[in-house]
């Protein structure tokens, strides 16, 4: 069985992935610049993969966790902020959100990789960290990311 800390890690990771997929779809369809659209495509693809990998790690360990069916209020607000934005304003909001969301994801993964109490999850966090750090690096180069 999972500790509360591991359970919280999984839920936060799942919410982050879910937000990235939804926001990425919007960026892919509504992004004004090609850079934003391509980044959105990559987020959908990479975070779908991460969701599947995390599910496999949990299954292999016999710890099925029901991940949230809907976004939490904070991520929902972020999606709503994108929904009402148009054109360059959309690109700017998406870019700024992506930098902060990936900073948060890096911190979450680093923390669990260092002190998580489930070995399989810790290994997954370590492996995932490099990809998410790369996402952060790319997000920081998006047009409008500087605010």
List the model feature ranges, each with a label:
Residues 1-147:
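His/Met- and acidic-residue-enriched segments that coordinate or traffic transition-metal cofactors
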């Amino acid at each position: 069985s999972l500790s509360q800390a591991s359970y919280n890690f999984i839920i936060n990771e799942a919410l982050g992935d879910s937000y990235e997929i939804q926001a990425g779809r919007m960026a892919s369809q509504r992004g004004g610049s090609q850079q934003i659209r391509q980044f959105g495509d990559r987020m959908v693809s990479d975070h779908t993969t991460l969701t599947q990998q995390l599910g496999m790690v949990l299954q292999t360990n016999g710890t099925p966790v029901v991940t949230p069916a809907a976004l939490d209020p904070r991520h929902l607000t972020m999606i709503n902020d994108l929904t009402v934005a148009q054109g360059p304003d959309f690109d700017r909001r998406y870019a700024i959100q992506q930098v902060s969301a990936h900073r948060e994801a890096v911190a979450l993964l680093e923390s669990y990789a260092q002190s998580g109490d489930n070995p399989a999850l810790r290994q997954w966090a370590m492996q995932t960290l490099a990809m998410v750090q790369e996402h952060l690096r790319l997000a920081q180069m998006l047009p409008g990311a500087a605010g």
